[in-house]
Amino acid sequence: MNNNIYEDISKRTQGDIYIGVVGPVRTGKSTFIRKFMEKLVIPNIDNEFKKDRTRDEIPQSGSGKTIMTVEPKFVPADGVEIKIKDTVSLKVRMVDCVGYIVEGALGHEEGGKQRLVSTPWSQEAMTFEKAAEIGTKKVIKDHSTIGIVVLTDGSVTGIDRKSYVEPEERVIQELKNLKKPFAVVLNTLSPKSEETSMLRSELEEKYEVPVLPMNVVEMEEEDIEEVMEAVLYDFPLTEIRINLPKWVEGLERNHWIKSSIITTLKQSIIDIGKIRDIEGIIQGFSELEFLEDTGVDNVELGEGVINIDLQTKQDLFYNVLEEKSGFKIEGDYQLLSLITRLSKVKNEYDKIESALIDAKIKGYGVVAPSLEELSLEEPEIMKQGKQYGIKLKANAPSLHIIKADISTEVSPIVGNQNQGEEMIKYLMEVFEEQPADLWESNMFGKSLHDLVKEQLQSKLYTMPEEIRVKMQKTLQKIVNEGSSNIITILL
């Protein structure tokens, strides 16, 4: 026995499982209740007195066309608590009803006229058919937390299948209107026949609900579990959890991959309300070209939660890496090589990062040497007065980053005064509308950006080598000798 099914049902109904068994008359509703009680409920009642009383309250059932149930009946009269395999506690009560009258059924007329019956719903007697309808509606609306609709192909009663169509349509529509979770059982003497399979497909397409063909008289525990699982799938869907590859989770929320997934999910859930509608979501995701596989990882029926796995295509990871980094990567071997190189670069950058920030903000930054860069000379004995000591000398490179603002100007000759004014006017218009486009303005076959860049580079590389060496020595002397004053003469 699958305890999880009953545990999940218990969660969704807060432990009280009131099952309304409804449908047209002469479909096998009472038989379904009898088999349900015999297979699941009675064996799990601990109290022997309650067990005997419940057995006595099981409704009569029989074959043929004669209506056996004449009024709604609670089985047992009070909800009975059962414990399944000492793990799941449930309070169970089933509700049997007469059902909607079908043409060809017997027992609702006397002498060619409708039988009059007394009911708790009216002080006056009413026709059997009217009482049956009121009772059926009350079972559906007021006395059940879940529903089991029992239909038939007519083989169990000898009544023509066409006679059942109109009343079964009414029952299913009423359950849908009330949004009660329910399952549909097709009672037949030949559940595995081709004709039954065709009827099942026809009913599923017509009512848009799963239909379970079975011979109710021969129903076993496994069949009951299948019916209860079908009911669970008819409960509302409360939460959808999407499992993505970890690298996708690391992308920013507005990245096109995440945006596509979120948009698809929003579009897919518009018409989804029940757990069994999950195929609509799966279908929506399967249309995303960058996904390799989409599937349901797990369904937590007791909570109404569905976990969906989304697997991306293998090359998507490399495409996104290229998009983010600018490096062309076509496989793991290239990725490993790139990571190795970038790791070395990062280690070097980490050393100068702080100094670089200081240079940008304050104009000057220093990179202190690491322990590995220290170079020790041989120790020397030194004399100071009458005492002796040891002199230890160490050398290490330090980096000094200085910010020097470079200014330049471009003064192209464009012709006479009018032409110069026209050029100024044009450049001002571009600057006001789209400042960034100003740099792309064409000047004698080159963009303004290229002209300025050439001027800046020319200034950077015109500093003579000997001047650079002198500046280095000067800085070295200031650092080592601690001079706080410097006189600079530029010639």
Swiss-Prot record:
Protein purpose: ATPase. Has a role at an early stage in the morphogenesis of the spore coat and is required for proper coat localization to the forespore.
This protein's encoding gene: spoIVA
CDD domains in the record: Ras_like_GTPase
A Pfam match: SpoIVA_middle
Chain positions recorded as ATP binding sites: G23, P24, V25, R26, T27, G28, K29, S30
Coiled-coil annotated residue ranges, if any: 334-362
Known EC number: 3.6.1.-
A single GO molecular function term of this UniProt record: ATP hydrolysis activity
Swiss-Prot/TrEMBL keywords: ATP-binding, Coiled coil, Cytoplasm, Hydrolase, Nucleotide-binding, Sporulation
UniProt-recorded name of the protein: Stage IV sporulation protein A
Motif (Walker A motif): 23-30
